[in-house]
Amino acid sequence: AALALRIHGAPVFFRRKGRGNYQRAPEEQLKAALAALERKAELARVQAGYVDALVAGTLPEAFHGKIMDLLVRPDKNTIEFKALETAAAARGMTAAQLVIACGGIESPRAWHQMRFVAEFFPAGTGFPPVSLSSPVDELPDAGVEAFSIDDITTTEIDDAISVEHLPDNRMRVGIHIAAPSLGIATGDPIDEIARGRLSTVYMPGEKITMLPAPVVEAYTLQEGGHRPAVSLYLIVDTTTHEVVTSETRVEKVFIKHNLRTNLLDPIVTVESLAANEGDYPHRADIVALWPLAQALHEKRQQTRIANGLRREMQRSADFNFYIDGEHVDIQQRRRGAPLDLIVAELAILANSTWGAFLAEYGVPGIYRAQRAFGPNRTRMQTSPAPHEGLGVAQYAWSTSPLRRYVDLVNQWQLVAIARHGVAAKMVAPFKPKDADLYAIVQGFDETYAAYAEHQHKMERFWCLRWLKQEARKQAVAQVVKGDMVRFEEIPLQLIVPGLGVHARGTRLLLDIVGIDELNVDLSCRLAQVLDAPVVSAEDAAAEAAETAAETAAETAAAADEAVAAMPDGAADDAGVVTAAAAPGDADDASGTSVDPRAPAQAPAAEDIEIANAEALPDVAAAGGADAVEPVHSHPVTGT
């Protein structure tokens, strides 16, 4: 019996042949099997060596060049992966933590960037060589001198403004948008690049542009020369601030100045505009635009109220990130400055007007639609519908074609109308019910959301780095809702478990217990309640109504799931393609560093974001800063 057991346990030397019978393995098979055993033993020895090196804090030579494959898309059968998992378990770390500890990745920041690039830019973030000629010499001259308003770090200048003062209490306002569509054709190599990226990716200290640098340089509205533009001209009654007529042109515009909010915000204030004071370029134009912007803003507020929403309310500060190596400087910037409002309202007006323009000529475009309440209330679609959060009848992203593909698509369609009028439906790149247009809608929404998630993560990362850098042991925060708080000094929100019941706006002193840059996590506990706001009955009722609306939205989510389960195309109606809410909507208040565990928030006034034009290519908006990309400005040092 013992012999039988030993033979049975040596399959290399003996093969089973029937019940209780064994046959000696042929010599050739035996040699091959023994060689395989030796290779396996050798691999085990190599793997053990890898484990020993990793546990000792040294990255084995064989791991160089394989780090991202091991961490992002591993082959779990390789000895490198098995060694990494074994060593990480032995040291009580994750695999990424161990690789950083061994010097395989420079820092947690590098890990976050490498993982994002590996997933969304597997071929790298560079561009192939491109050739492009600007059609500026072929375009009619607008005969105006325009100016842009942007943050000092902005390089992709999409929009500019001109003002002409007319008799009879009227003025002509020109909204001039960079026109890369004039040099890019659908399906050409540059279009393929832009469609592959769909948007510029923003994050503190850096960005990954949608278009190659030569294209941006050819079409950005840089001061000191004529630039191709798609212009929207509005004749405005300066007494009532009503838009009398509008006109769209394709032309070249002379850009006189690139104004910078960093320099002008201290000068261009509500008080200085009221007194018509200050020494800065285009003062008369900005003074004339200020009451128009206020009137446009108030009109949208009345529409919001009619939609069952409250008026927009903005927090007092925005935040700019300045990155120098691994050091971060987070500076507060006054929110809601007059220049912000002017740029915001004119951009909302342009996107709404051009949305109606597309619909009037029956040319499809890509619209943002939003219901005031309900689940999945924000969607992108190819037919016009109200954006109740912004308080406009329709809204088509059109003012950031250098950094967002949807705007480039809409610009192609607008140019077709401007040049061909009623025949535009026949010559526009995208026809009604175009399957390619539907594909762009769906692909853009998914990609844009992923980019925004990475932006939020990196904003949160730099907030944690700032706390560590400043050696903060405590910080002051305000209650947002439930266990969620918002820090006062930095744009950081997080959930503090067991916080207790506090009114919204209550100021708290928090103890900072732990900072984890790799997992982008912060642990805090309540140290002291500093002060609590006085809550009026009206505010309490409004908050209760919001809570009830959120509860109703959750209940209605089952209906959306049922629609999602329908066969492809069954849920489409008149050219509508539903998609999840994208960044910039009130649902996630793009730009606020939101805890990924945080629940989606209703379109509360507290979630309104207004920012400078680098982070805010279109506008700041409420009910969801729709058209907003990142909300914070992300200066790139050294550029």
Q: What is the role of each PLM region?
A:
Residues A1-L5, D52-V55, M68-V72, L132-T506, ...:
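Electropositive polyanion-binding surfaces
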Residues Q23, L518-E543:
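OB-fold/S1-family single-stranded nucleic acid-binding modules
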Residues A2-K17:
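Charge-enriched amphipathic alpha-helical scaffolds
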